[in-house]
Amino acid sequence: MRRRLCAHFADHGPRLACVLAAALLSVLPGRAQDQTVRVIAFGAHPDDCDLGAGGLAAKYAAQGHKVKFVSLTNGDAGHQSQHGEELAKRRRAEAQEAGRRIGIEYEVLDNHDGKLLPTLEVREQVIREIRQWKADIVIAPRPNDYHPDHRYTGVLVQDASYMVIVPNLVTDTPPLKRNPVFLYYSDRFTRPQPFRPDIIVSIDDVFDKKVSMLDAHVSQFYE
């Protein structure tokens, strides 16, 4: 089976046919093929980004590009026996180990698992993350997931997508000069419409690295 990451443009610009990884870089405005690209991916929980974009992250990191994963919650609720700060501390350490294994940054924010809402406060956190990373590419879930934390992660990134260039909002962090390219992770949801990829990136050559990332999340996959 050919392993791949699929992505869908989050804006309403011209659609692209399915292309390989190098072509993804070519759609970035004002970017030469040999320039370093800065990618940031958002998930609701520690391990969400790994599942959605671990292969792409490993591939781009190996090519010298800069990649960061951000979990909007600290994962302090999703376990059979542990919970609270003890679990959050463990999940944060697992995420950082996952990032270390492929050479990317991994940040876990301190919002509570299962209680994420699309508030102005969290939207501003997302705007700061995108600006501080000086992102060229932003990846997030579509805002139609069954899980409210996943769904609201999509809403928050979608709401932040325009605001990252507005100078009079979140004034403690300089705005970007131009909008990044915003992409969605692939999914199997059919409402309001099925996912249709614009970009497909083969991850056959880095699939073992993606598995290694997931293996770091012991509390998520082995307990």
Q: What name fits each language-model region?
A:
Residues 10-14, 52, 200:
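Intrinsic disorder/low-complexity detector
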Residues 2-3, 20-21, 28, 32-42, ...:
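Metal-dependent de-N-acetylase/amidase catalytic core
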Residues 1-12:
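N-terminal secretory signal peptides that target proteins for export/translocation
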Residues 6-8, 19, 95:
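General helical structural elements
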Residues 11-27:
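Bacterial N-terminal signal peptides
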Residues 32-133, 155, 163:
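Active-site rim/loop-helix segments in enzyme catalytic domains that contact anionic ligands
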